Amino acid sequence: EGMSLDSFLVVNNGNYFKQVMIPVVDEKYFKNDMIVLFYNYATLPSSMYPNDRSNVDNWNIDFVYFDKNRSYNDITYPLITFSEKSPSLLKRYQSMPYRQYKSNPTVAMSTNYRMYFINLDSAGANVQYSCKIENTTNGWSYDYEADWSTVSPYANHGIHEYPVHFNNFLFDMDDKLDMATYQITHIVNVDENSSSAKGDTIVGLQVFNDYYAYDDGTPERGYGVVPDDSYFASQFTISVPDTLCGVQLLFNRTHNDANYDFFDIVVWNDNNGKPGNEVYRLKNQRPIWD
């Protein structure tokens, strides 16, 4: 038995973050072992293309906060947190083959990235960003600390964008290995003399294995290839000769399996940044859904 949370149906107008206040007044929920579960209901859009009719509704719950004696004006929290996931430290990819990285590491690395903070408290605070990069195999590590800075409340300033600059940073390299993983711990510390708010920590992994990836594989968006005989291509740049053994694709299932169509997987060589001559074609493939 649960509660219908119609307040989530309000259009968010593109805001980054929307706070919803839900009064819990029924005593049957006043238990120490109460479990909070959220279920969403997706809608199917009307579209001229049947293969667009899929689960395009996408929303996320940031955090759930319970407290007694609250009111609708109680909308701040003593927290200064990260509002985005750990970024890739590579210039072009989320992940790439270790042998390709080792052949030209300077070109592969990004010289800067951006972290995003959100101050949910009612007042500003002095904070410091730091990170620690650790090789999960051999213990090699690298530490970075930024200068202290002031972050204003979200209600006044919104999201804080913090640029991070690494000067000539490279991951350590082991010629004997064909893969490596680095744990990257991001920390935002709060000066206790400026605020009683708590800071935050997030952890990400930088993986060098045997594949290229532009993102972390989380299905956040999708698109269809229409009309018939259309195609799209993804470009991957290599530093040393390599072998393509396979590709991994996610097909988002649509209403009545409208996108259960045949397609070809094609490999082209490069022609000034665009597909050139066809070098391989795997014909008549179809999506496979779990």
Regions found by a protein language model. Give the residues of each.
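Short, well-structured beta-strand segments enriched in hydrophobic/aromatic residues
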Residues: 30-40, 175-187, 247, 290
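Beta-sandwich/jellyroll recognition modules and their flexible linkers
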Residues: 1-116, 121-127
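Conserved aromatic beta-strand anchor motif in extracellular beta-sandwich/beta-rich domains
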Residues: 1, 131-135, 265-269
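Aromatic- and Gly/Pro-enriched, solvent-exposed loop/edge beta-strand patches characteristic
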Residues: 9-15, 257-290
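Activation corresponds to long, low-complexity, non-globular regions
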Residues: 70-207
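Short strand-edge motifs at loop-to-beta-strand transitions and within beta-strands
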Residues: 18-22, 160-162, 232-234
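Short coil-to-beta strand junction motifs in C2/discoidin
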Residues: 58-59, 124-129, 256-265
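Beta-sheet-rich sandwich/jelly-roll-like modules and their strand-loop junctions
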Residues: 185-273
